[in-house]
Regions:
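Alpha-helical transmembrane segments and their immediate juxtamembrane cytosolic regions
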Residues: 1-331
Length: 331
């Protein structure tokens, strides 16, 4: 099973659709509860979406580079990975400043920025580290992250308290070393330290992709994906007793749990679509094969919709007032 997998395109597309829905609800005052992220510790269905996309980033790296093994010019490949990651990062910055272009209030982190870092580091890991070490790298990194977040004293504060946003090492690093503005006044969910475990989410995708392109029997490969996923879910539950499931911190338990679910979902979609030939996900496939473009287009259109830079009044206000005038209340 080599090359482009329809199941991965579909899964990426479905994930992207939910990312757009979650990020652009229309009104933050009237959002269906499952489409909101957990305030801090805890989990909602929405908290699964972004890590699944990062997982697919890892899978896609393997599917793309595996076809060229033996033909790869490593230096050229490195340059391409760096250049693409840089472009994704710049687009993320553009979405933040558009359409006001207020460079005094720029946010250097964000969804696309995190995707760019995950793509960059996972690409390098795939090129320079033996595949058999991927899981060791993941587990060791997540245990070190767990230790840092639970046991390393915060300068000027003391022992961390993971029950609140302001009393952890990730907050301390972002507050003191992250330039620009943060998503929240005191912390950023795509901050510096939390990017490390998010990269491991991408490495889990590298592991899944490596399994998918191996020469083993397809049934054995899908079962292996499922069982790895199941084990990771149990490991995540174990760590949650000391380091709660928390998307904002990309906690160790959260990384294991979401990675495990992505392993199992990848196995299920591969079986359903690539093995059984289920073909009723055409729209998701279109989104999945043009994911970054679609995400950026949605961001630009929404920014214009809520901006008064063009005609002096928000298009959203015109739309909402028109609905109200016709007796339809947008709640």
């Amino acid at each position: 099973m080599k090359g482009r997998l329809l199941s991965i395109d579909v899964l990426r597309g479905m994930t992207l659709i939910f990312m757009i829905i979650v990020n652009q609800p229309g009104s933050w005052d009237n959002v269906f509860a499952p489409l909101l992220h957990a305030d801090w510790n805890g989990l909602t269905p929405t908290d699964y979406i972004f890590p699944n996309f990062l997982f697919i980033v890892g899978v896609s790296i393997v599917l793309s580079l595996n076809n060229k093994k033996g033909l790869l010019d490593r230096n050229k490949t490195i340059k391409k990975i760096i250049w693409r990651a840089f472009k994704i990062y710049l687009v993320g910055l553009f979405l933040w400043i558009f359409p006001s272009f207020d460079f005094d209030n720029i946010r250097w982190t964000g969804v696309l920025q995190r995707i760019s870092f995950v793509f960059l580091f996972c690409g390098m890991i795939y090129l320079f580290i033996e595949k058999r070490y991927f899981m060791y790298l993941s587990v060791i990194t997540l245990i070190l992250y767990w230790f840092i977040m639970l046991y390393i004293p915060i300068p000027g504060i003391g022992q961390p308290d993971l029950s609140v946003p302001e009393l952890n090492m990730a907050h301390y690093i972002d507050k003191n070393y992250l330039p620009g503005i943060m998503w929240q006044d005191t912390w950023d969910p795509e901050g510096i330290l939390t990017t490390i475990p998010s990269i491991i989410t991408g490495v889990f995708g590298l592991i899944a992709g490596t399994i998918l392109v191996s020469s083993k029997d397809l049934k054995d490969k899908l079962l292996k994906l499922f069982y790895i996923g199941l084990i990771l879910v149990f490991v995540g539950d174990f760590f949650s007793w000391s380091f709660p499931v928390n998307k904002n911190l990309w906690s160790t338990s959260y990384t294991f749990l979401m990675g495990g679910m992505s392993f199992m979902l990848t196995a299920a979609f591969t079986y359903l679509i690539d093995v059984n030939g289920y073909k009723k996900f055409k729209m998701s496939q279109v989104f999945g094969t043009n994911s970054i473009f679609t995400y950026v287009l949605a961001g630009v259109l929404v920014s214009l919709f809520y901006s008064d830079y063009i005609i002096g009044i928000q298009l959203n206000s015109i739309f909402v007032n028109t609905l109200i005038d016709t007796g339809v209340y947008p709640k």
